[in-house]
């Protein structure tokens, strides 16, 4: 039961912090799962927010790190076919397929020189049912079905253009959740439960979700794709 609750609230991070925080529904699932102390282990202290979360497609076609600091958010795509910054001559995709999510998290953290506190492992081949439960989604003036959006995650992001498009989908779905009604959002939550795993506690996810609200609104959000031509410097590859 605790695991299912944790999976439910993973939507707080990737897609829809507003619903998980703003609705009573989120509070109903808090009892007996996680604690404030666990949340502070992720964020450092009650008042200072600084954490990194890995978002991985189970097919290995998209890896992103969401880095939250007080007042700003970075969404960084890591090209799956690229190799770690130092020490290994094998791709992140191969590391994930052969050694799993924990080793991938470790190598990405080393390459970015950032702390990565947890992960969300999402089967994006199931995104269709989630989006359709929301009644479709509009992105850049066009309405997409869930099946159309799945296409963005059916091959590895080998360049900045593909990685940027994948980020666009994640952010757009988040905004769509924020505008969804309570019952429609609840239905989509149940769909999302079936395609997500996480190692984060509910209390930590709720804190992260609250911090992500400005980013979903387009405030203080920096986007990047790494590495580009071997360059791991985030500041020189900012997309926005």
Predicted regions and their residues:
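Non-catalytic, solvent-exposed segments at the cell envelope interface
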Residues: 2-240
């Amino acid at each position: 039961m605790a695991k299912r609750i944790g999976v439910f609230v993973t939507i707080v991070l990737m897609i829809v912090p507003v619903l998980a925080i703003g609705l009573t529904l989120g509070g109903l699932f808090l009892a007996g799962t996680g604690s404030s102390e666990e949340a502070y282990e992720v964020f450092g202290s009650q008042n200072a927010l600084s954490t990194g979360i890995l978002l991985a497609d189970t097919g290995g076609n998209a890896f992103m790190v969401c880095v939250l600091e007080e007042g700003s958010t970075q969404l960084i795509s890591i090209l799956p076919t690229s190799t770690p910054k130092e020490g290994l001559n094998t791709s992140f995709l191969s590391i994930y397929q052969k050694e799993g999510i924990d080793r991938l998290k470790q190598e990405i953290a080393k390459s970015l020189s950032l702390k990565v506190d947890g992960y969300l492992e999402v089967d994006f081949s199931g995104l269709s049912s989630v989006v359709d439960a929301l009644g479709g989604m509009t992105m850049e003036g066009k309405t997409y079905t869930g099946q159309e959006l799945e296409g963005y995650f059916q091959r590895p992001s080998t360049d900045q253009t593909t990685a940027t498009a994948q980020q666009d989908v994640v952010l757009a779905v988040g905004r769509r959740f924020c505008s969804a009604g309570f019952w429609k959002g609840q239905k989509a939550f149940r769909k999302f439960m079936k395609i997500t795993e996480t190692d984060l506690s509910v209390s930590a996810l709720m804190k992260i979700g609250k911090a992500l609200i400005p980013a979903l609104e387009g405030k203080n959000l920096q986007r990047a794709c790494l590495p580009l031509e071997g360059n791991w410097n985030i500041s020189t590859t900012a997309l926005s």
